[in-house]
């Protein structure tokens, strides 16, 4: 779940990477000036989604997407498609 595309998307695009997807990082390394935080709430440090030049948590992103299509921090278009850089921590699927 999360790393595989649906059958319709795979039939449409094949195995090539889909353009325009924002990456969601589960654990970011420490930056030059400390930890990376959500620029809207300043509390979230995990599960951040890259906006144009800053990061947003999933909660703040959904709140901003319910208000409109533009970011309150930078004024650019909000990301709507997310790709996980690491696989989420879940038990392996035995099927």
From Swiss-Prot:
Zinc fingers, RING-type class: 38-74
The cross-references to InterPro entries, in alphabetical order and at most eight, read:
RING_finger_Z_arenaviridae, Z_RING-type_Znf_sf, Z_RING_Znf
Record keywords, A-Z: Host cell membrane, Host cytoplasm, Host membrane, Host-virus interaction, Lipoprotein, Membrane, Metal-binding, Myristate, Viral budding, Viral budding via the host ESCRT complexes, Viral release from host cell, Virion, Zinc, Zinc-finger
Q: Name one GO cellular component term.
A: membrane
Cystine residue pairs: none
Predominant location category: virion
Describe its membrane topology: Lipid-anchor
Q: Which GO terms describe its biological process?
A: viral budding from plasma membrane; viral budding via host ESCRT complex
Residues with a covalently attached lipid (N-myristoyl glycine): 2
GO MF term list: RNA binding; zinc ion binding
Looking up Pfam families in the UniProt record yields: zf-P11
What does the record say about domains? Answer: Late-budding domains (L domains) are short sequence motifs essential for viral particle budding. They recruit proteins of the host ESCRT machinery (Endosomal Sorting Complex Required for Transport) or ESCRT-associated proteins.
**Complex and partners:** Interacts with protein NP; this interaction probably directs the encapsidated genome to budding sites. Interacts (via RING domain) with polymerase L; this interaction inhibits viral transcription and replication, Z partially blocks the product exit tunnel for the releasing nascent RNA product. Interacts with the glycoprotein complex; this interaction plays a role in virion budding. Interacts with host eIF4E; this interaction results in eIF4E reduced affinity for its substrate, the 5'-m7 G cap structure.
Q: Which family does it belong to?
A: Belongs to the arenaviridae Z protein family.
Physiological role: Plays a crucial role in virion assembly and budding. Expressed late in the virus life cycle, it acts as an inhibitor of viral transcription and RNA synthesis by interacting with the viral polymerase L. Presumably recruits the NP encapsidated genome to cellular membranes at budding sites via direct interaction with NP. Plays critical roles in the final steps of viral release by interacting with host TSG101, a member of the vacuolar protein-sorting pathway and using other cellular host proteins involved in vesicle formation pathway.
State what protein this is by name: RING finger protein Z
Q: What is the lineage of its organism?
A: Viruses, Riboviria, Orthornavirae, Negarnaviricota, Polyploviricotina
Gene designation: Z
């Amino acid at each position: 779940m999360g790393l595989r595309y649906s059958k319709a998307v795979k039939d449409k695009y094949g195995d090539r990477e889909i353009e325009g997807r924002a990456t969601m990082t589960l654990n970011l390394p420490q930056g030059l000036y400390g930890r990376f935080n959500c620029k809207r709430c300043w509390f979230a440090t995990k599960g951040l989604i890259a906006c144009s030049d800053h990061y947003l948590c999933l909660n703040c992103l959904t709140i901003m997407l319910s208000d409109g299509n533009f970011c309150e921090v930078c004024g650019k278009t909000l990301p709507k498609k997310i790709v996980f850089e690491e696989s989420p921590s879940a038990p392996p699927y035995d099927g």
